[in-house]
């Protein structure tokens, strides 16, 4: 444990940032799972409502990923890869049907 006042403060700041980053990453993962679930629903029952749900889920996931990249919680290549995976999931469903 640190004895110097500035070192103690840095430890507190690092912990605060770790928790903030963890919540952002968790939110990104949750939105990605919701998107994949919406894509599966669309695959099982391709309808206009399902397509709208997929588009809304994609928009929410893209937005959260972009915000995480902007705050430097995710590296920009990691964010781009996640967005690419989301797009490919929908592309495979739409080209198959």
Curated annotation (Swiss-Prot):
SUPFAM superfamilies: Ribosomal protein S20 (SSF46992). One of its GO terms (biological process) is translation. GO terms for molecular function: small ribosomal subunit rRNA binding; structural constituent of ribosome. One of its GO terms (cellular component) is small ribosomal subunit. It holds the Pfam family Ribosomal_S20p. Keywords: Ribonucleoprotein, Ribosomal protein, RNA-binding, rRNA-binding. It comes from the Bacteria. Coiled coil: none annotated. Binds directly to 16S ribosomal RNA. HAMAP family: Ribosomal_bS20. Belongs to the bacterial ribosomal protein bS20 family. This is Small ribosomal subunit protein bS20. It comes from Gloeothece citriformis (strain PCC 7424).
